[in-house]
Amino acid sequence: MTNPSDRVLPANSMAESREGDFGCTVMELRKLMELRSRDALTQINVHYGGVQNLCSRLKTSPVEGLSGNPADLEKRRQVFGHNVIPPKKPKTFLELVWEALQDVTLIILEIAAIISLVLSFYRPAGEENELCGQVATTPEDENEAQAGWIEGAAILFSVIIVVLVTAFNDWSKEKQFRGLQCRIEQEQKFSIIRNGQLIQLPVAEIVVGDIAQVKYGDLLPADGILIQGNDLKIDESSLTGESDHVKKSLDKDPMLLSGTHVMEGSGRMVVTAVGVNSQTGIILTLLGVNEDDEGEKKKKGKKQGVPENRNKAKTQDGVALEIQPLNSQEGIDNEEKDKKAVKVPKKEKSVLQGKLTRLAVQIGKAGLLMSALTVFILILYFVIDNFVINRRPWLPECTPIYIQYFVKFFIIGITVLVVAVPEGLPLAVTISLAYSVKKMMKDNNLVRHLDACETMGNATAICSDKTGTLTMNRMTVVQAYIGGIHYRQIPSPDVFLPKVLDLIVNGISINSAYTSKILPPEKEGGLPRQVGNKTECALLGFVTDLKQDYQAVRNEVPEEKLYKVYTFNSVRKSMSTVIRNPNGGFRMYSKGASEIILRKCNRILDRKGEAVPFKNKDRDDMVRTVIEPMACDGLRTICIAYRDFDDTEPSWDNENEILTELTCIAVVGIEDPVRPEVPDAIAKCKQAGITVRMVTGDNINTARAIATKCGILTPGDDFLCLEGKEFNRLIRNEKGEVEQEKLDKIWPKLRVLARSSPTDKHTLVKGIIDSTVGEHRQVVAVTGDGTNDGPALKKADVGFAMGIAGTDVAKEASDIILTDDNFTSIVKAVMWGRNVYDSISKFLQFQLTVNVVAVIVAFTGACITQDSPLKAVQMLWVNLIMDTFASLALATEPPTESLLKRRPYGRNKPLISRTMMKNILGHAFYQLIVIFILVFAGEKFFDIDSGRKAPLHSPPSQHYTIVFNTFVLMQLFNEINSRKIHGEKNVFSGIYRNIIFCSVVLGTFICQIFIVEFGGKPFSCTSLSLSQWLWCLFIGIGELLWGQFISAIPTRSLKFLKEAGHGTTKEEITKDAEGLDEIDHAEMELRRGQILWFRGLNRIQTQIDVINTFQTGASFKGVLRRQNMGQHLDVKLVPSSSYIKVVKAFHSSLHESIQKPYNQKSIHSFMTHPEFAIEEELPRTPLLDEEEEENPDKASKFGTRVLLLDGEVTPYANTNNNAVDCNQVQLPQSDSSLQSLETSV
């Protein structure tokens, strides 16, 4: 039968249809996905004959999915497109060269070199006039004078080398980051049904017609239409701006859109649009992902004088973006607000980044001052010597000669500046981070934001989940309470009556996600594989242990027959499924935290399988005799129950009425063993000065038992264990607001937060970060796996998401993904983070020594000899050594266990410690003494001609060649000294493990030999004899001996030494700058300093920000940041027939986590989660069972004291003491023991 829609297809669509051999075209599907609710249903039913018929047109099976035939998949990609957003083309090498040329100091040096080059060819009339000053006059010197152009050319050549090296580094960095980006994209997979099998497929390989399995926590990778759903709720705020979750069902609204988040429930959808044809892809295209086209349009608009009355896209609070309709009052009002808008605080940069920028500004100021002073003194010296002392007149024919001198002085000054400015600093940071990130992958840390790597080195606290992180996430049922009997081991199925066994099997098999399965082991003799939710897998394993087949039950009751599903969420803490009874009526199976489910039970099955009354007293006895002993063994307790309904259908939306009067079938104890390596890892954290806190949804007894096994709690420690409710009661005032002062009294001793919600976790993390208690501010790392962990992961300094158990939303919010979900991987991240910090410090120690010596030598030489002993080209070579090569050598040191034996650095600890300052000044002292002796007495010692006060264009001298060679060799050996920055004696320790370091030092030494022996005039060098080389080498090796002497001097005795490179302290922040970050304070200092052109130093920030090319996902804020904010969206781009509603588009959903969408290929990465936009306080969602609190007075009376591990009583109200041995704990009595125990699934 022909469908009506076949007759209304446009001609071009029919052509496409015939070409693709599908019953619908790309444009038809695009238009279909723009519809919502009833409109969409009408279109699907009227024009396509329902979802089933649409699947037929797309040649796919709603149950089996696509066959997976490669030819069919390729055909679908050709017709409907790939599920990727075309990335922006990477910058070409020439573009990177052009960017490197923009450096201010290099530009000035280039100009000076060109002037020098031009003047060298100019032969003024008065060149041979003695009144014009000291010029080469001998025949030999005249040849040299004619070769005066060489110096200018050599400087230009050196600049070209520096530029090419910089561009190559940038190119290789971008290439590496794109490689890392591809790795992240490969990690993003989605559940797809193909050929009847559920497989995990990379999102870029999804095609139109695929059947996708949708579940809680997923980030939808493509547009689709719902085929089957269970209590499905979607957060569409990323597209519509609507903050409420949207219920999706077959009869109301089946449209699922890419970039939206599954907040609840599960289901299946048929994919209808991918890539640029999906709703997210269309909007990204409109917003200008293809910047080149936008730029062309803007240029044309300017040429044609087009008035700019298009829409403005504005960012707000760094997280939200809103596009207003044309000429709307709302848009006008917002424009007015924009005019009055105050600068919004940006997200705080990393600790190291802020310190580096601040230090670079300080060094830059000092370098600029010394450079200007050098030029001034050289000119002053020249003027006084020629026009005052020698009383020479200023002759017109002498002007070009004087200009040549001035240009030479200027070149020397600029060269001093080039050496002084720490240009290698950003390179060292980037190399160190990139190297660390690459190596961290092998340690199961997939770094999404590069700065998180070094921030982890500063971590002072880790708030860790329990399940899967501290434990193995290999759950098994080991105890059960059924029919009034507590089974300490799994019983034989023969002990149960058939009807009881059926209730257990059905209650578990039906009331679990059908994606949770137990599969045979991969290797013979291995453990069965658990797929899906681990708690549900434990229950399914219990069914298997009872010799029953859960799959047979599911085949009898397929997902399509489930009448109503109340899926698990952080509010319900339970899951319930309703099915129709064959004999009429309904049956509902429920499972969840034992305390919550038992509170809703009024009957329980006895030994005979009969339902008997279950009173409050019975419930309390059960808690005391069954649940508490299980919890003290570290078991999670889950209750299974059911309820029958008659034929009269109740109001299923009234959960409080539905989820009552249950009959308890069983309570099971689930074991999740502690990972064997975790106690040792936590001991290392304690040694490293890092406090580990466990934040879990389990009850207090289970949490305390696990924390004790892990080593978080030890007997005798004065630490707190609190439940979420008690925690909130202690930190909030009468209005329910969190008070920092109250929180500051709790968190220092808090070690376990049990029965906590995601909001509690966020409150704790925010409180610790914002706290000013203690000597240093805390740097907090957090682990999370659920959708609701997004706010805490965002707030934390470093957010760790679980790679295996984590939802897409949690991964999008994280900085690092733990690919093995293991706590020990976090400890490795700490090691790498500290190693990055040490690598930067090593480089700083080395570079600042070079800076100090080179600048002082040039300055002093200028003052005394009217020339710099180190020539411009030589200094550029030194600059190349200490920038590119040294950063490569010192930034690639592998970490060692000794890094964990030190305390965290903290936010305000300086980059340059007093020990480092001792090393810098000590080695600078040695080098300066040697250089000055060589400059002023070297010719006598070596019996050679002096190179001081050489005339203009004079040939290179052996004297100054020895000075240059000795200087470079001292830097090479000091590079070995710089490997150790904490006063260690053995600087060669582990040197052979770092092949890069050895290669760089050896390579630099070989290059130095070639420069000295064959460099000639361009490098101002002449060849040296063997004895001169040996002397230079001996003085260089003296650096190592001198280093031993310096390390023997105790730093404590040198109290006059000061530290440098602090972060911004509170006292330094003015009132109007409180919202700004470290970078902003550094920039404000620059503005005060009136050194506008010196803002080229911000290359450091720019180069560190190459991190952004590596970050995953994208935000529209990132898209728009690259555009001129005055540029409006061209509404004409939107076809009237497919008008996209963008009135509040993407409101409160676009975030900073990822800033450059053009680096992303997968559309799956394009949206981040609206929950990440955190207000100062998050409203706490009340739990269902909180409404059933019998008496608030009893509750407060119940929690009166906290018992510490050493038995000491504190005034904190807490129902859950911290005693390790549950049998010795005197629990306070109350009407209901359940008030002390609340567990989450």
UniProtKB/Swiss-Prot annotation:
Q: Which residues lie on this side of the membrane: Cytoplasmic?
A: 1-92, 172-356, 428-840, 892-911, 975-993, 1048-1241
Q: Which residues lie on this side of the membrane: Extracellular?
A: 114-150, 377-409, 861-870, 935-952, 1016-1025
Instruction: State the superkingdom.
Output: Eukaryota
Q: Name one GO biological process term.
A: hippocampus development
The active-site annotation reads D465 (4-aspartylphosphate intermediate)
Give the record's subunit note: Interacts with PDZD11. Interacts with SLC35G1 and STIM1. Interacts with calmodulin.
- Provide the protein name: Plasma membrane calcium-transporting ATPase 4
Q: Which organism is it from?
A: Homo sapiens (Human)
